[in-house]
A protein has these predicted regions:
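N-terminal hydrophobic/helix-forming segments and targeting peptides
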Residues: 1-336
């Protein structure tokens, strides 16, 4: 797999919660020849299976959906109002966006607001809310745009050195990790069967991962998601670029799974980081563990989460894939 090319295609793909078809098609192509089964379930997950020696099952999940917006109102003046799904309203003025109509057309627009010259002193000090913003699509006929149409960022991803910038790296970059793990497993013996879900609708509650875990009933489940790469603030865990995967420890991650991930990293010289997780993880794991699965979380450091330009380090993708492939090959019957 050409990691940078895959990241670019995935970043550009359209995939709000429940509308992941384009992303699903990309991942279906990436896993071709690496798995024994691949299918789409009724929740919109892409499920893949690679069989080992049937001594147990380990399940990985990485979500395909992205933060986005919905058209909430079409104004008589010819502008659109929005509601957000996971987006930070402070970042939105002047952002280019795509409006995805029900007929399948894409229309370009720009998020605007009242110019500073026209604002009062009070409104200039006020943080923007969605009620202060609108989408200008410069059209006189709005008949093709409907309330409920999805709106996504329109921006061009790019790379510099080992770093990649673009939208929707949360969590499609972790889908790339699954693919690269599967590539490595072609050269490794593994007793456990490997199931994976490129999951749907995580940004609104991780519903896809829950239905997949319920249907597959694995022994072990690991969510792959992004976490905050914070290099400067002493008030947060110091997750850094280029220092490898981040392994969660805490209330929800199963202790045996976290410990085995850590031991696998140590034994194979893989750099890793630890992140405390005192309550819910905010990942697919919160739903996977509800199905009585021994669950863990492995995260990819990322800056600028839920913005038009998220940032990751590709070295961390490679090290995480290496860790997970060796973790799978180390699993033995009765490990949990």
């Amino acid at each position: 797999m050409d990691t940078f090319a895959a990241l670019k295609s995935l970043s550009l793909a359209y995939g709000p919660p429940g509308r992941e078809k384009e992303v699903r098609g990309l991942f279906k192509g990436y896993v071709n020849g690496l798995v024994d089964e691949v299918f789409e379930d009724t929740s919109g997950n892409l499920i893949v299976k690679r069989y080992g020696q049937h001594k147990g099952t380990v399940f990985f999940s990485a979500h395909m959906d992205e933060v986005c917006f919905l058209v909430s109102k079409v104004l008589p003046e010819g502008f659109l109002r929005l509601e957000g799904i996971g987006a930070d309203v402070k970042l939105l003025p002047s952002q280019k966006v795509w409006i995805h109509t029900r007929s399948g057309k894409r229309l370009r627009g720009v998020i605007g607001m009242l110019a500073p010259h026209l604002q009062t002193e009070e409104t200039r000090k006020k943080l923007n809310g969605f009620e202060d913003l609108f989408v200008d699509v410069s059209m006189s006929d709005f008949s093709e745009i409907s309330v409920g149409d999805f709106v996504t960022y329109d921006n061009e991803p790019f790379s510099t050195g080992d770093f990649f910038f673009g939208k929707s790296l949360d969590d499609r970059a972790c889908g790339v990790i699954i693919v690269k793990m599967l590539e490595r497993l072609t050269a490794l013996r593994h007793d456990f069967d490997v199931f994976a879900a490129f999951s749907s609708r995580e940004e609104i509650g991780a519903f896809g991962a829950r239905t997949a875990a319920y249907a597959l009933q694995p022994d072990i489940g690991i969510a792959l998601d992004v976490t905050h790469a914070i290099d400067t603030s002493p008030n947060y865990p110091k997750n850094e670029f280029g220092k490898g995967p981040v392994i969660a420890v805490g209330a929800i991650p199963h202790r045996k799974i976290s410990n085995l991930l850590i031991e696998t990293a140590k034994q194979n010289g893989i750099p890793y980081q630890i992140e405390p997780s005192p309550s819910r993880t905010g990942t697919d794991t919160d739903q996977i563990q509800l199905e009585t699965v021994a669950a863990g979380v492995v995260s990819l450091p990322l800056r600028y989460m839920h913005t038009p330009y998220e940032q990751i380090c590709v070295k961390d993708i490679d090290e995480t894939a290496r860790l997970l492939a060796l973790f799978v090959s180390a699993l033995k019957e009765g490990v949990v």
